[in-house]
């Protein structure tokens, strides 16, 4: 059944699962919820009709943020230790980007952008193409 929908069954310990998915799934959902909330707060604070001008990025994040809130609350609470560590790492990296932007550190920010772009290439090479129904596995 799992293979029929394009998935692969991988056995791993609960601890390993929770650590991996805290970064690959749980943190991205948390970021999506927070980005949409930030847009909502910005809209109220600045009195701009921000949502009307939502670009592809915000629209993509809002799709994730529209996920089932009860399920995600439970995931966040049940994997709080690993998610908290993932948040700390994210904040550290976000602050590093902020520092580079504020200091106009061209070399550092370009290195970050190039290195993170390589992750997308690796994902595609693993045949995880999100634009295909089976993630490009066939």
Placement of each model-derived feature along the sequence:
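Contiguous C-terminal substrate-recognition/catalytic subdomains in enzyme active sites
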Residues: 92, 102, 108-138
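Internal alpha-helical scaffold of NAD(P)-dependent oxidoreductase catalytic cores
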Residues: 1-60
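Charged, amphipathic alpha-helical oligomerization/scaffolding segments
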Residues: 22, 26, 89, 115-118
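Short, surface-exposed, polar/charged, turn-prone segments marking secondary-structure boundaries
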Residues: 37-40, 62, 103-105, 129
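Interdomain hinge/lid region at the active-site interface
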Residues: 47-115
């Amino acid at each position: 059944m799992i293979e029929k929908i394009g998935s692969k069954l991988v056995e791993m310990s609960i601890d390993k699962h929770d650590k991996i998915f805290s970064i690959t799934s749980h943190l991205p959902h948390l970021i999506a919820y927070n980005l949409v909330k930030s847009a909502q707060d910005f809209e109220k604070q600045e009195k701009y009709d921000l949502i009307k001008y939502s670009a592809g990025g915000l629209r993509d994040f809002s799709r994730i943020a529209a996920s089932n809130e009860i399920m995600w609350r439970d995931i966040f609470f049940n994997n709080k230790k690993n998610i908290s560590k993932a948040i700390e790492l994210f904040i550290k990296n976000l602050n590093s980007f902020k520092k580079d932007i504020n200091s106009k550190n061209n070399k550092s920010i370009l290195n970050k952008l190039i290195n993170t772009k390589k992750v997308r290439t690796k994902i595609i090479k693993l045949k995880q193409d999100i634009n295909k129904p089976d993630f490009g596995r066939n």
